[in-house]
């Protein structure tokens, strides 16, 4: 069983040069091609392309100019610790021990507009490039065209050694759109997290993001190899609702605060 997450805009860029556990992104040559293209954009062009403020656009111009290879712990950081958004608040990677991190390395993947597919311990340098960006490139009109079948191929390769070839989709719609569903090996399950208030259940973006991280952590901590035990997930007060669920969409609800 394999789970996928989206990345985060908020980053912790503090480096740990002595970090022992690290790997390199598997699609790095494709990343290098994108970096070369993005280095040709000035702040105004980047602001227009990514809908960024002038300050953020300038920051990312500097980031792309500063990219340098090869990646080492002295100039890059493991993806699981670099990303700091709501999903990663729920994941709490900083409190995982080495065995948990090694399990995550085998059973968790992070989709990325710049890196394609990341393993948790893959070294990355800071960036901003969302999967939905309409970046015209040599392969098509956007990043979905650029990554093509690379994403699903890497996910299939990752799950090949697992006894249970089920993908748990904890990514956003924007990011998972890059995975060609028809070519995905095995079953697909997308957990849906809803808040119940006044008798009505709704998806609240912030809460759903954190819940996705909490479920990923639950899967890692429990060393889950098959999806059925995920129905016992109850972190944060969520409860699985079989009557609201389907084979491919598992609904979890909790009472809104």
Swiss-Prot record:
Transmembrane segments: none
Superkingdom per UniProt: Bacteria
GO biological process: response to hydroperoxide
Gene Ontology, cellular component aspect: cytosol
Pfam families: H2O2_YaaD
Family affiliation: Belongs to the UPF0246 family.
NCBIfam families assigned to the protein according to its UniProt record, in alphabetical order: PRK02101.1-3 (NF002542)
UniProt-listed PANTHER family: PEROXIDE STRESS RESISTANCE PROTEIN YAAA, PEROXIDE STRESS RESPONSE PROTEIN YAAA
Protein name (record): UPF0246 protein Mmc1_3117
Species of provenance: Magnetococcus marinus (strain ATCC BAA-1437 / JCM 17883 / MC-1)
């Amino acid at each position: 069983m394999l789970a996928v997450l989206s990345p985060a805009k908020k980053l912790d860029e503090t480096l740990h040069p002595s970090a022992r556990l690290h790997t390199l992104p598997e699609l790095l040559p494709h990343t290098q091609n994108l970096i070369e293209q993005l280095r040709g954009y000035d702040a105004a062009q980047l602001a227009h392309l990514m809908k960024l403020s002038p300050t953020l656009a300038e920051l990312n111009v500097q980031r792309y100019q500063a990219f340098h290879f090869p990646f080492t712990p002295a100039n890059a950081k493991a993806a699981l610790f670099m990303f700091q958004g709501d999903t990663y608040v729920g994941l709490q990677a900083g409190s995982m021990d080495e065995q948990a991190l090694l399990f995550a390395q085998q059973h968790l993947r992070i989709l990325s507009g710049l890196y394609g597919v990341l393993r948790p311990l893959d070294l990355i340098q800071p960036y901003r490039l969302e999967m939905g960006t309409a970046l015209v490139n040599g392969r098509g009109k956007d990043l979905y065209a650029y990554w093509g079948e690379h994403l699903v191929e890497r996910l299939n390769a990752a799950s090949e050694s697992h006894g249970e070839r089920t993908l748990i989709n904890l990514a956003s719609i924007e990011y998972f759109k890059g995975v060609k569903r028809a070519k995905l090996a095995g079953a697909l399950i997308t957990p849906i997290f809803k808040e119940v208030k006044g008798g009505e259940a709704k998806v609240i973006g912030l809460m759903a993001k954190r819940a996705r991280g909490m479920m990923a952590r639950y899967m890692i901590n429990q060393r889950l190899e098959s999806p059925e035990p995920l129905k016992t997930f109850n972190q944060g007060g969520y409860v699985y609702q079989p009557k609201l669920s389907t084979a491919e969409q598992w609904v979890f609800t909790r009472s809104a605060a």
